[in-house]
């Protein structure tokens, strides 16, 4: 038997807190911070120092039971229960990621993303906030009926109605989880909840007990945990564990923490929480200071065994911890972490591209792992080194994360059945024969223009076509653009609104401006253009262009996407797609207080 020095130090609040407490207790013979770090490094401490710790604990009114800190103690066997080297990946792209401005997805789009997340190997898929709106409930329920391997989860406040809606929504899933939360920081309890700490604990316990009526897999989150008082956190976490919570999530809701503090916080909290060794501890970090991934990794060092993250780091404000960076950090630096995930890393880039296509959020070229430049080398010295031996300048291979995914998919001679089968392989399932026929017709048109069609082309094509399937939408029909040097470009465009054909013309400072003005001359939406961007779907001059348009009106922000080998046609499609969402997709009546954790 051996003492767990890390837990022992954490019991006193961490290295710095312990050093200060020892100095106050015995100023002349106190151990220094450096000495305490050495205890942790060696995994042992002198008997004389152990006696001082015992005396310190007694002076604080909490006698030290050394049996609780023996390595073989039952409370430390969490490693055996949850496989200490196995990290659970909890993907919240469909819930927290969707809270990015304009990133709202349709039910069909969410199902496509969920299928890809299951293919990626995400252990938990947080499909949404079922009580937020009827649309959210339908999407969570549809995903619960679709996903068979991953656990499907719904978020809910610590309110009975929310929890019961979540329970009903995830009911069809073979593996289901309810994730309930309440704020625990002093500022949130006083100003947002207007509740006393005792009331917050009572609400949390009640919430967990109701959730257990629907599933044995219940996660509890302490919103704004990293700004909460740790003794109160230990109390509320202990109470919900006793009530039946199986995962405890500690969110850095406002991205306030820094890595070494995060690690210490987790160590101390786990040590102080009654029955803390009987649950999985989870980290949910936001990126306001650019430290979400670093804090997530630090939490794992501190004892967490679940991380909550999103594809491409998508999320409101500065985003969330990105799943691709966490997974590859654990894989590449296995020598330091010794931790494993169940992620198929070759699906990382396909997942990134799909989420980017559907949400309209392009990936920055220098983004780690999934950026277009992630494996590019401009320096001649670097290029020479990589050619001679890849590992001179690359710590992982492009193929290992799926950059070989530009696979030749289909050709102009491919038939309808081959097309349907390929869509199924990509996780794309169209709801009707009409939708399949429309998508296949678009594919044949594309095949006549483009010799090689890749998986990415099909994702872009289907996303574009699905947006046109709604009868209550703006639908692109055709356009003619006239430009001449020195003259204002003119756009003549034909489009449909609820099946009624409209014609419009306008001139502008450029062809894009002319297209937008022509559409607005009929639509009169009153929206403001926030973002217009164009990206090539694949390489080559005949590649499809994927265009994103972000429109804002009042407090609503929407993204529209269009894809075509003709960039100006893609531009018109994207603008019409955004207008469809703005005009015909009702704004979600979010439940009050249903913000991010």
From Swiss-Prot:
Catalyzes the condensation of the acetyl group of acetyl-CoA with 3-methyl-2-oxobutanoate (2-ketoisovalerate) to form 3-carboxy-3-hydroxy-4-methylpentanoate (2-isopropylmalate). Pfam families: HCS_D2, HMGL-like, LeuA_dimer. It catalyses: 3-methyl-2-oxobutanoate + acetyl-CoA + H2O = (2S)-2-isopropylmalate + CoA + H(+). Residues 87-349 form the Pyruvate carboxyltransferase domain. Residues 87-349 are annotated as: 2-isopropylmalate synthase. One of its GO terms (cellular component) is cytosol. GO terms for molecular function: 2-isopropylmalate synthase activity; acetyl-CoA C-acetyltransferase activity; manganese ion binding. Its EC number is 2.3.3.13. Belongs to the alpha-IPM synthase/homocitrate synthase family. LeuA type 1 subfamily. This is 2-isopropylmalate synthase. The gene is leuA. It is an enzyme of class 2 (transferase). The keyword Amino-acid biosynthesis applies. GO terms for biological process: L-leucine biosynthetic process. Its cofactor is Mn(2+). It comes from Neisseria gonorrhoeae (strain ATCC 700825 / FA 1090). Homodimer. Keywords: Amino-acid biosynthesis, Branched-chain amino acid biosynthesis, Cytoplasm, Leucine biosynthesis, Manganese, Metal-binding, Transferase. The keyword Transferase applies. Mn(2+) binds at residues 96, 284, 286, 320. Residues 475-597 are annotated as: Regulatory domain.
